[in-house]
Curated annotation (Swiss-Prot):
GO terms for biological process: translation. GO terms for cellular component: cytosolic small ribosomal subunit; nucleolus. One of its GO terms (molecular function) is small ribosomal subunit rRNA binding. This is Small ribosomal subunit protein uS15.
Amino acid sequence: MGRMHAPGKGLSQSALPFRRSVPTWLKLTSDDVKEQIFKLAKKGLTPSQIGVILRDSHGVAQVRFVTGNKILRILKSKGLAPDLPEDLYHLIKKAVAVRKHLERNRKDKDAKFRLILVESRIHRLARYYKTKRVLAPNWKYESSTASALVA
């Protein structure tokens, strides 16, 4: 996928395996994988962190092939999904970090410019999630309350 605020075209991407069946050497069942997902979500991990742990520690390459559903959909069915979508959360976290940096370094013009770019991405993503009804229609990003969102 191409970059929004950079010249790179971003042509490289990871390739999914052609076979969509569960490997024969995997001994975990669908229920075992779901229990692991619930346990990791209760620890406060994000869906992508859960996927990395399942891949690296338990040998589950794709949760969707084993369970039939994606991690976020499994979490939503149990009511464990995060309030904010993960990509929006990380953008807000980045904006808070840049703003904190700007408090210490007032003359950093490049950081000020990057903050504008990050916040414009936040507004664009928030508009998308409002149309998809993931966020409430009255949800609004404000820099003053952003640190409370990611704390």
